[in-house]
Amino acid sequence: MVGEAANGQDAIRVANENCPDVAVLDYGMPLLNGIGAAREIMRVCPRAKVILLTMHTDDHYVLEALRTGIKGFVVKSQAPADLMRAIHEVLGGMVYLSPRVSRTLVQAYLTKSALPADPLTPREREVLQLVAESKTTKEVAKLLGISAKTVESHRTRIMKKLDTPNTAGLVRSAIRLGLTQV
């Protein structure tokens, strides 16, 4: 183990400093969730393979992770032995899904569920997560290294895309999309 992180931004910093073979990320990390952190870690350290540790098993979470390039998806309730298996599989060049997740994906495939495309850009998802975590516009701007005006522009586009008129609706959407937890 080369490092530990308290949030998504710390995880990126640790990965940038150490470029690990495998990064195990919690989906529900504060500041930047596991998916957002994974995107950035894979950008700064292309050889790193990411395993997502989560309690979510709905097909849209799994598909979002796979589209991002995550190589392992481990359900927390199945963790210790499952995580070790995932690390070995991923290091061997395979993709690993917890058995519970595999069943969910097969069921979704068999019922031919139409999964809607994500309407938000990665940056909009970051802004939405931080807004849902009760960050002010100034705090979001500082954390993301952008202006407050840009944050407001993102927020306006997010509200339009998600068809919600207020912050409460944004928080509900963030929970539904798995960007934050209650």
What residue spans do the PLM features occupy?
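Short hydrophobic/Thr-rich beta-strand motif most characteristic of the beta2 strand and flanking loop
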Residues: 1-6, 14, 164
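Acidic catalytic/metal-coordinating carboxylates
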Residues: 7-10, 31-36
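Short amphipathic alpha-helix used as the core "switch/output" element in two-component signaling
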Residues: 13, 35-47
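Active-site beta3 strand of CheY-like receiver
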Residues: 18-24
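Helix-turn-helix DNA-binding segment
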Residues: 107, 114-150
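Basic, Lys/Arg-enriched C-terminal extension of HTH/homeodomain DNA-binding domains
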Residues: 159-182
